A protein has these predicted regions:
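Conserved GNAT acetyl-CoA-binding A-motif
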Residues: 127-140
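A conserved beta-strand-loop-helix scaffold within acyl/acetyltransferase catalytic domains
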Residues: 65-74, 80-81, 86-98, 102-105
Length: 167
């Protein structure tokens, strides 16, 4: 059933749909499980609880990143097999088919195992599914973003990745 809703998810990854409720609003969330270079399974999913966003903020602060979350931000987080937060990214929707990716961070202990690569790939799949065609980032970590297909486009004031939208 999850594959019918999200046909662009890699068949090598295990996916599940988890229902969460916030007040009166019920939501289906896609959870992807992926194996990294350390041979361990990691989960990639949106936050289910406000405290997960608070923990993500702590990871950003530990990485010397000064950030302010707003109600327009959306999050995609990574967790280890003991459900400990290992990193994530956050973005905001701009107009129709554009999002601005604010920051990507992985805790030091979990770097160099391709977790950020899996997270970015998952993020691109989700954005593609949502009909997003353009992802912009600032001029930071240019090597990292270039590896993920971002190119400098002055008219967007930063680096840009153009997705092949399904719609």
């Amino acid at each position: 059933f999850a594959r019918m809703l999200f046909p662009n998810v890699d068949s090598a990854d295990y996916i599940e749909l988890v229902a969460t409720t916030h007040g009166h609003e019920a939501r289906l969330n896609l959870v992807t499980q992926t194996e990294c270079k350390d041979g361990k399974i990691y989960r990639i999913r949106p936050p289910f609880l406000p405290k997960e966003i608070a923990r993500f903020h702590s990871i950003l602060t530990e990485s010397s990143l000064s950030v302010t979350f707003t109600s327009s931000h959306e999050f995609l987080l990574t967790f280890n097999n003991r459900n400990r937060l290992t990193g994530g990214l956050y973005w905001k929707k701009l107009e129709n088919n554009r999002v601005h990716l604010e920051w990507v961070v992985i805790r030091k202990k979990y770097q160099k195992i391709e977790l950020s690569k899996r997270l970015m790939s998952d993020f691109f799949d989700r954005m593609n599914h949502d009909g997003i065609g353009i992802i912009t980032v600032g001029f930071y970590a240019q090597k990292f973003f270039a590896k993920h297909g971002f190119k400098i486009e002055k008219q967007h004031g930063g680096m840009v990745k153009r997705l092949q939208t399904m719609g």
